[in-house]
Amino acid sequence: MDISRKTDYALRMLAMLAEDPECLLSVRTAAEEVNVPYSFARSIQHGLVQAGIVESLRGVHGGMRLKVSPDDVTIRQVVEAVQGPMVMNDCTAPDGDCARMGACCYHPLWAGAQALMRDYLDSVSLGDIVAHRQFPAVDPKFANREAFPEYATCACACREE
């Protein structure tokens, strides 16, 4: 299970939109803010539109904006919109196939880890991120954002062009 750079950039773009839900943000501005090529930002936008997370408005004053409340978008939804289903191992994929299926002692381990990851990312919304709410902690040392001051904020802003 790997959270891709593309997903990281998507989350940063969405945080910019969530900071100001009325904001209409151009893909070009989003690309500049997260420091990615415009074409890459467009492909991210496409996945988010397809998932119903953002809407895209064309034209000179066009751009993208959140289609739903930030509190209604889970981190798992974003991950899966950008990179597809979250799977721990090929055997746990929706169409997973393994020659040892049914006889492998590791399948329950991978399936359990996958379920924990999905449930955890379903428990955190985009709204939680931008509002700096405390995340549910798997381990108490990760519950306190102040333990990670360099990651305390998204440093996101919607700028007018």
Tell me what each language-model feature is.
Residues 28-35:
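A short alpha-helical element within helix-turn-helix/winged-helix DNA-binding domains
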Residues 95-161:
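C-terminal regulatory/oligomerization modules of transcriptional regulators
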Residues 52-67:
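Beta-hairpin "wing" of winged helix-turn-helix
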Residues 32, 49-50:
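Alpha-helical residues within the helix-turn-helix
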